[in-house]
Regions:
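Alpha-helical solenoid repeat scaffolds of the TPR/TPR-like class and their adjacent stem/linker regions
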Residues: 1-182
């Protein structure tokens, strides 16, 4: 397809996913931004006159959401790294994830739900959360920055659930996972 139409966004997007699956992160993430131009894209990019954040820019950085909950959770592994490079970090995220993120990341990060208004006076630069790996996950070694769990469960809820599940004497517990369709 790309030999016929070199700028065919769907093919470039699919190629980026292929590169990522082959662990060629540098090439895969470099082409990942074509997701905005693919024919079945339903995400609307954040509109702002402020510039995109890049690693050489220091200031107040707004990270805005895209894709589904699973993607937001996956990309959030990079938050500690961009936090270190920003003067102030502001994250707009699905409301359901705010408590989890508040437990898991530095306490001075500011969070907004997806329906809350953020004005351009509040930030200097912005970036979609799915674009962060372009700067922080270029090689397999870069994933080692997270040498353990990066999300923290609500220990009270987890303990209550564990007690409830174990109260009937059952020895085997089965975890649940989901698969997103977006």
């Amino acid at each position: 397809a790309l030999s016929i139409k070199t700028d065919y966004a769907d093919a470039i997007w699919n190629r980026s996913l292929a590169y990522l699956s082959l662990k060629d992160f540098n090439t895969g993430w470099a082409q990942y931004d074509k997701r905005w131009k693919q024919s079945n894209n339903t995400s609307i990019p954040f509109q702002s006159s402020k510039p995109y954040w890049t690693p050489n820019k220091s200031g107040r950085v707004l990270i805005w959401p895209e894709q589904g909950l699973g993607d937001l959770i996956m990309f959030s592994s990079v938050i500690p790294e961009i936090y270190k490079q920003s003067k102030k970090l502001i994250i707009q995220i699905d409301d359901r994830l705010i408590p989890l993120f508040k437990r898991s990341f530095p306490t001075d990060i500011i969070y907004y739900g997806v329906k809350e208004k953020i004005t351009e006076e509040q930030y200097d630069f912005h970036i979609p959360i799915g674009s962060l790996p372009l700067y922080f996950r270029k090689e397999l070694q870069s994933f080692k920055h997270n040498n353990g769990p990066y999300l923290k469960a609500d220990t009270s809820r987890a303990d209550n659930l564990r007690s409830k599940l174990l109260s009937d004497g059952t020895k085997n517990l089965i975890g649940i996972s989901w698969h997103s369709t977006n």
